[in-house]
Regions:
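Extended, subdomain-level signal for the structured scaffold at the beginning of enzyme domains
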Residues: 1-78, 86-90, 112-122, 131-166
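A short beta-strand/loop micro-motif in the catalytic core of glycosyltransferases
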Residues: 78-79, 99
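Catalytic, metal-anchored helix/loop core of enzyme active sites in primary metabolism
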Residues: 82
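A conserved active-site-flanking secondary-structure segment within enzyme catalytic domains
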Residues: 94-121
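Cytochrome P450 catalytic-domain "roof"
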Residues: 127
Length: 166
């Protein structure tokens, strides 16, 4: 459950139920990608990751791409932090939309996002309709707060923001 009025629930999904992390830990997910259908969820949030740790293998996972496309087709909020914007771009949902991504590595990811059809910005957070993209790890909390605002309302998101000192 998410703090505030406790009306939001957070669920995790992965290619498998046990997902190894870049730093040697394992995340036990609630669902596999095949089990996720947008009809049962209000929003989608995607964390970024490191290319050198095979983060982008999900870009070749048909079930993962289906999930993104389903949420986009239903105009449901989608949040992507850091390099997760690249995964959104690979589905085509960022074509002619404003978006941002990780700005380090001499703009490598910004350039890739542009080649995927996005209108690239260098803002910390970019909102284009129901899609929220964040520029890097430091954008994670502001992106999450915006996603909460879109799903459970401004007042609750503001209350959570205040509790967290933002």
């Amino acid at each position: 459950m998410v703090a505030g009025n406790r009306s939001a629930k957070l669920y995790t999904a992965g290619q498998n139920k046990d997902v190894p992390t870049s730093f040697g830990h394992t995340i036990h997910t609630h669902y596999t990608f095949a089990e996720v259908h947008s009809a049962y969820f209000e929003a989608l949030a995607l964390p970024g990751g490191f290319a050198r740790y095979d983060y982008f293998s999900t870009a070749n996972d048909d079930e993962f791409l289906r999930i993104i496309k389903e949420f986009a087709a239903e105009n449901k909020p989608i949040a992507a932090v850091c390099t997760a914007s690249i995964l959104l771009g690979k589905t085509g949902i960022l074509n002619n939309r404003h978006a941002t991504t990780y700005q380090g590595e001499n703009g490598r990811w910004l350039d890739q996002l542009a080649t995927l059809g996005a209108q690239v910005t260098t803002e910390q957070i970019c909102i284009d309709g129901p899609i929220i993209t964040g520029s890097g790890p430091s954008s994670a909390i502001p992106v999450a707060l915006k996603l909460l605002e879109m799903t459970i309302g401004h007042k609750t998101a503001e209350s959570i923001s205040d509790m967290m000192g933002f």
